[in-house]
Amino acid sequence: MSFDVLTINPGSTSTKLAVYQGDKVLFEETVRHTMQELADFNNVQEQFDFRWQVLRRVMDAHGYDVKKLQAVVGRGGLLRPVAGGTYMVTEKMIDDLKENKYGEHASNLGAMLAKKLADELTIPSFIVDPVVVDEMQEIARISGNAFVTRKSIFHALNHKAAGRKIAKELGKDYEKMNFVIAHLGGGISVAAHRQGKAVDVNNALDGDGPFSPERSGSLPMNDFLEACFSGKWTKRELHELIVGRGGMISYLGTNSMLEVEAKVQAGEEKAIEAFDAMAYQVSKEIGACSVVLQGKVDAIILTGGLARSELFTSKIIEQTNWITSVIIEPGEDELEALNSGVQRVLAGLEKEKEY
């Protein structure tokens, strides 16, 4: 049996919407938001009415009768740490998102928009595998200093979707497989997935793991400490050096990997060095996650937008294919992943979780 489900993915400069009937897309649309449109809003919460109007306009433009919907699902935002799965949107969840209790991001609006429409239609609303999915084994939380605990913040939605898809192609259940999955995008997260749980993963947001097109990843602590007290940068500027202006931007002045590849193919030495170093760091993290799984790795999966780059993935494959087979699952279809999670719950294949 298939169900009509609206999926909502609010991003920092776009709102992505799609209606599915089972796994069939009835329509999909991405609405881009200019900086001028968003300039009047002081924070993400102030954008709610603006995004709501976008949602209603898109539904009306496609002539879809919202009364046919059987569920609405939004991108999960910054919440308290939770296990992976599909969650019913509750008032407690909405309160935490409205208060930005665990951080501010455009994805915080996903559950809020989903619940508003679902409540009007008296149907359920959900989120699926938010970025705060935390399934880390206890030993992985220990950082090396008692005042700091390692946190799980990663591209959980795409990790889980890629893991389930590859497991299905292999004729297995994701919950019975051991994978090392690397999401390669503006941020990079590499996780050890043991029997359906991400038991260790780098914090892809706060300065941990490989550097990426715009994030610094792990840095030598003493040098960064010196920078903090040098008086050269404010706290906000230092944070931007970690997230937003780190990684490739700091080395080459761009976060466009198309531009970086063009420089590499033109033989620019600095570009080749940075490009190779990023692939090296990703490969090293994959190796570390293979140790977490004690070498029992069914496959290494490379996913995300950068997985489309044959030049980049080939460098990772060269350094890791001695561990196990490397499978490329490029891109990240977050709307499809949101829909799949809800379809499984509505069909009774999974039970929804409560926040």
Swiss-Prot record:
It catalyses: butanoate + ATP = butanoyl phosphate + ADP. Its EC number is 2.7.2.7. It is found in: Cytoplasm. Keywords: ATP-binding, Cytoplasm, Kinase, Nucleotide-binding, Transferase. The keyword Kinase applies. One of its GO terms (biological process) is acetate metabolic process. The keyword Transferase applies. One of its GO terms (molecular function) is butyrate kinase activity. GO terms for cellular component: cytoplasm. It is an enzyme of class 2 (transferase). HAMAP family: Butyrate_kinase (MF_00542). Belongs to the acetokinase family. This is Probable butyrate kinase. It comes from Listeria monocytogenes serovar 1/2a (strain ATCC BAA-679 / EGD-e).
